[in-house]
C-alpha cells in the first residue's frame, strides 16, 4: 500500500514537471513570435506594431532587459526621449550591459544632459573598454563638460584601439579647434603615412544598438 502511494506521488510529480515544461515551451514560443513581429515592425517603420509586440513581451516577462532596450531604441527613433530614457534606465537596472548603458548615454547626450551622459558612458566603458566608438562618445561628452584632458585621453585611446583615418581626424580636429597647430600638423603627417594594420577596421566600429 505504501509503495502504491509512493508510485502515485512519483507519477504526480512527473506529470506536474511535464506540464511545467510544456507551459515554459509555449511561453517561449509566444515570446519568440512576438520578437519576430517587433523586429519586422522596426525594419518596416511600423512603430506602433513593434511597440505593441514589445509591450506584450514585457507583460509576459517584466524583467526582459532586451525588450526594454529595444523599446528604448524605438522611442528614440520617434524622438520620444523621456520614454526612451525610462526604458534604457530600466534595462540597465535589470541587466547592465555595455549596449544598454551606451544607448542611455546617447539619449542623455541628445537631450543635453551631459553629466548623466558622461556617467553612462563611463559605466559602459568599465564593462567594455576595447571599442573605439565608446571612447569617441566619451570624448564628445567630456568636451561638452569642459574636461579637455579627458577628451584628449579618450581620443588617443580610440586611436590605439582603431588607428584609422576617422579616429586620427577626430583628434586632429580637436587640436585645430584649440589652436594647437603643431600637434595638428603632427597628426596630419601621420595621416599621410597611415597604413591601417591588417585586421584593424578602416572606419570606427559602432557598437551594436541592442543585445538580444
Locations of regions flagged by a protein language model:
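Alpha-helical segment of the N-proximal tetratricopeptide repeat
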Residues: 23-83, 93
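TPR alpha-solenoid repeat register
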Residues: 67, 100-101, 134, 167-168, ...
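Short coil turns that delineate tetratricopeptide repeat
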Residues: 62, 95-96, 129, 162-163, ...
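Register position in tetratricopeptide repeats
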Residues: 43, 77-78, 110-111, 144, ...
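Long, contiguous interaction/recruitment modules in multidomain scaffold/adaptor proteins
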Residues: 1-33
Amino acid at each position: 500500500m505504501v509503495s502504491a502511494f509512493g508510485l502515485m506521488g512519483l507519477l504526480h510529480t512527473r506529470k506536474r514537471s511535464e506540464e511545467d515544461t510544456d507551459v515554459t515551451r509555449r511561453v517561449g514560443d509566444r515570446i519568440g513570435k512576438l520578437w519576430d513581429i517587433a523586429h519586422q515592425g522596426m525594419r518596416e517603420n511600423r512603430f506602433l506594431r513593434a511597440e505593441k509586440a514589445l509591450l506584450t513581451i514585457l507583460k509576459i516577462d517584466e524583467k526582459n532587459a532586451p525588450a526594454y532596450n529595444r523599446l528604448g531604441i524605438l522611442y528614440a527613433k520617434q524622438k520620444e526621449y523621456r520614454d526612451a530614457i525610462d526604458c534604457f534606465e530600466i534595462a540597465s537596472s535589470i541587466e547592465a550591459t555595455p549596449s544598454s548603458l551606451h544607448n542611455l548615454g546617447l539619449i542623455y547626450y541628445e537631450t543635453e544632459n551631459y553629466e548623466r551622459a558622461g556617467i553612462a558612458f563611463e559605466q559602459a566603458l568599465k564593462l567594455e573598454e576595447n571599442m573605439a566608438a565608446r571612447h569617441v562618445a566619451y570624448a564628445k561628452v567630456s568636451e561638452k563638460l569642459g574636461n579637455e584632458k579627458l577628451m584628449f585621453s579618450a581620443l588617443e585611446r580610440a586611436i590605439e584601439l582603431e588607428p584609422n583615418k576617422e579616429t586620427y581626424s577626430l583628434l586632429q580636429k580637436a587640436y585645430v579647434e584649440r589652436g594647437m597647430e603643431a600637434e595638428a600638423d603632427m597628426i596630419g603627417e601621420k595621416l599621410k603615412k597611415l597604413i591601417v594594420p591588417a585586421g584593424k577596421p578602416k572606419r570606427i566600429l559602432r557598437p551594436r544598438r541592442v543585445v538580444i
